[in-house]
Curated annotation (Swiss-Prot):
CDD domains: AdoMet_MTases (cd02440)
Domain of life where this protein originates: Bacteria
Protein name as it appears in the record: Ubiquinone/menaquinone biosynthesis C-methyltransferase UbiE
Function: Methyltransferase required for the conversion of demethylmenaquinol (DMKH2) to menaquinol (MKH2) and the conversion of 2-polyprenyl-6-methoxy-1,4-benzoquinol (DDMQH2) to 2-polyprenyl-3-methyl-6-methoxy-1,4-benzoquinol (DMQH2).
GO molecular function: 2-methoxy-6-polyprenyl-1,4-benzoquinol methyltransferase activity; demethylmenaquinone methyltransferase activity
Pathway in which this enzyme or protein is active: Quinol/quinone metabolism; menaquinone biosynthesis; menaquinol from 1,4-dihydroxy-2-naphthoate: step 2/2; Cofactor biosynthesis; ubiquinone biosynthesis
A UniProt-annotated Pfam family: Ubie_methyltran
Species assigned in the record: Rhizobium etli (strain CIAT 652)
Length: 258
């Protein structure tokens, strides 16, 4: 189950927000979005989540419960600014090593600068690479995390297969992503916020509404909780589950390589 689909001319198309684009074009378009918002990425998440992303990320780290021992290795994908990786390292008592992978160099630059300021550089490695082609040996990591990034990957099924490959046996996948609201009243409120307020706030903050319009649309195009859980199972993961946050505005998906 992939979000890619065959176009009339036989090529592959995928969604870029509400638009259908050739599969090979999506990554470049997404890169442009994140180059524009890199310096204000955390503010962007505050706008997108009404400030709740910080609570959800803390809950994600609590679920991971990183081991407080040397040699514990985590791969944080699409984590350029370091927000998740910093939390992992701190939660491990600065014992864990987190590899932060992102396809966007602007985001990684922000993360590396923040790591220096937090004096966490010794526990972090920053890698510019594609989630669909991870530059690591099989069975390299104890955990794989990705927060609000999987929906921007052109071929989600390929990224999940790569996650499975690089995890050690007994390793865990955790995916935090905006999802399908399961409360009718909240759904209407969040829809109004998303399509009316978020692009305008984005324009006020960055001078450009377009990146925020894409991000709102990409949330609506992402598979719902049950369908995404099915994709995780198809990638080979076991004990797949999800936990809704704030009525399903976001969901934390978990799977194990057993």
């Amino acid at each position: 189950m992939s979000e890619s689909r065959t176009s009339a001319d036989g090529g592959m198309e995928t969604s870029y927000g509400f638009r259908e684009v050739p599969g090979g074009e999506k990554q470049g378009l997404v890169n442009q979005v994140f180059h524009k918002v890199a310096k204000r990425y955390d503010i962007m998440n505050d706008v997108m989540s009404m400030g709740m992303h910080r609570v959800w990320k803390d809950a994600m780290i609590a679920a991971l419960n990183p081991r407080k021992e040397p040699g514990y290795k985590v791969l944080d994908v699409a984590g350029g600014t370091g927000d998740i990786a910093f939390r992992i390292v701190e939660a491990s008592g600065r014992q864990a090593h987190a590899t932060v992978l992102d396809i966007n160099g602007s985001m990684l630059g922000v993360g590396a600068e923040r790591a220096e300021k937090k004096k966490l550089s010794a526990n972090l490695t920053f890698v510019e690479a594609n989630a669909e082609e991870l530059p690591f040996e099989a069975a390299s990591f104890d955990a794989y995390t990705i927060a609000f990034g999987i929906r921007n990957v052109p071929r989600i099924d390929v990224a999940l297969a790569e996650a499975y490959r690089v995890l050690k046996r007994g390793g865990r996948l955790l995916v935090l992503e905006f999802s399908e609201v399961d409360m009718p009243l909240l759904d209407k409120i969040y829809d109004a916020w998303s399509f009316n307020a978020i692009p305008q706030f984005g324009k006020a903050i960055t001078g450009d509404a377009e990146p925020y319009q894409y991000l709102v649309e990409s949330i609506r195009k992402f598979p719902n909780q049950e369908n995404f859980a099915a994709m995780i199972r198809q990638a080979g993961f076991s004990r797949v589950s999800h936990t809704n946050y704030t009525g399903g505005i976001a969901a934390l998906h978990s799977g194990w390589k057993l």
